Amino acid sequence: MTGTHTDIPLFPLGTVLFPGGLLSLKIFEQRYLEMAKGCMRAGTPFGVCLIREGAEVGAPATHEALGCLARITQWDMQQLGLLQLVAQGGERFRVRATRVRADGLILADIEILAEQADTPTPEKFRACRQLLERIVTQHGERLFAKPFLLDSSAWVAARLAEVLPLPAATRQKLLELDDSQQRLAIIQRLLLQSALLAQSASSPERSGQS
C-alpha cells in the first residue's frame, strides 16, 4: 500500500508491531470480531498502534500517531465468540484523523510512510546479527515469519526490537525511526549497556495481546 487511505480500522494494543513481525491475538470484543471478519472478507489490513492511555478492552484508548498495518495470515475459532488469529506487520503509517464508531471501533485516515532502501547489515553490527542468528536457530518460526533475512539491516533491527526486553516506549521510538541502521545503532548500544551481547540468547517470547 502507498499514499493515503481512509477508514482503516485501528486496534490499539500494549505492544508495538514492526514491519514483517508476527502478532498473535485473542479477540472477543464484538467491535474487533467485526473488524477481523471484515478484514478477512475483503483481504484488507487493520492498523496497530501502541496505547498511550487507556486499555485494550473497554472504552477506546488514546494511541500513538505512528503505527504499523497488520494483515491476518491465520485464524481459528474453536470456541464460540473467541477468535484466535495471527497477523503479520506490513507498512508503517501515520494517523492523520480518527473517528469512533458507535460500537467503539476507531477508524483512521492514514498516510503510508515511505521506507528507505534496505541495505546489508554492516560489519559494525556483526554482534547484533550473531545474536539474532542464535535466536533464530533456537526459536525459528515460533517467533518469526520466513524468510529469515539476516543480511537485511531492516529485518535484523526489527526482529531484535521485537524480542529484546525493551520498554514499549523504547520500541515505539525505534518504530518511528526511518533509518534501519540508526535503529541498529541504538539497539547495539542498549545491548552493550545491558551486557546482553556477551550472553547466550535466552528464550524470548513475542507478546501476544488479547
Model-inferred region functions:
Residues 1-210:
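N-terminal low-complexity, acidic/polar interaction/targeting segments
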